[in-house]
Amino acid sequence: MPDGWRMGKVSEIIELHDSKRIPLSGQQREKMKKIYPYYGATSLMDYVDNYIFDGIYLLLGEDGTVINSEGYPILQYVEGKFWVNNHAHILTGKNGFSVEMLYSLFSLTNVKDKVTGAVQQKISQGNLTSIDIIIPSLEFCIKFNELIQPIFSQIRSNRKENENLTSLRDTLLPKLMNGEIEVDSIQI
C-alpha cells in the first residue's frame, strides 16, 4: 500500500443525511405542483412542490433493488434542489472525499455481502458504514478531485442542456402538431 494510505471503514469518508428524509405518499405528491425532483432508491420517481436538499449528493439505494446483477450498488449522482424518500441513503464526502470520489469508489465496490433481506433487499446504515475500504492520503484525494471535477462538471452541464432541450421539445412539438408554428416559416 502506498505511503499515507491505510485500511479504514466507509464511516470515515461519508456524511449520512438520512435523518432529513421525508417520504411522501403518491396521494400527497398528486396534489403538488411538479417543480423539484423526488428521488427513490433507484431513480427519479416524481416531481414535488418543495425540496429538502440543495447541492450535489450521492444517493445509494437502501431498500428495494439496491444492487445490480454483479453486486454493485445502485447509485444516483444528483444536484440542485430535490426531495428524497426514505428508500435511499443520502451521502456527501468528508476527510478529502468529494461526492464524485464517493461515486467513483462505490461504482467499484461490490456490496453484495452487505445486503440483507430475503424478500426485500436492504443495505442498512450499519452495513454501509462498516464496509472495509482503502483510504488514500489527503494529497491523493486532492489530486484525484482535481482530475475528476472537470469531468463531473461536464456531466452536470450536459444534464442541464438535456433538460433544457427536453423542455423546448415539449413546448414546441404541440405547437407544431396543432399548426400554431409552421416549419415552412422558420428561417435558418
Protein language model regions, located:
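DNA target-recognition domains and sequence-specific DNA-contacting regions of bacterial/archaeal
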Residues: R6-P136, Q187
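Non-catalytic DNA-recognition/assembly elements of restriction-modification systems
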Residues: M1-P23, Q28-G40, I134-V183
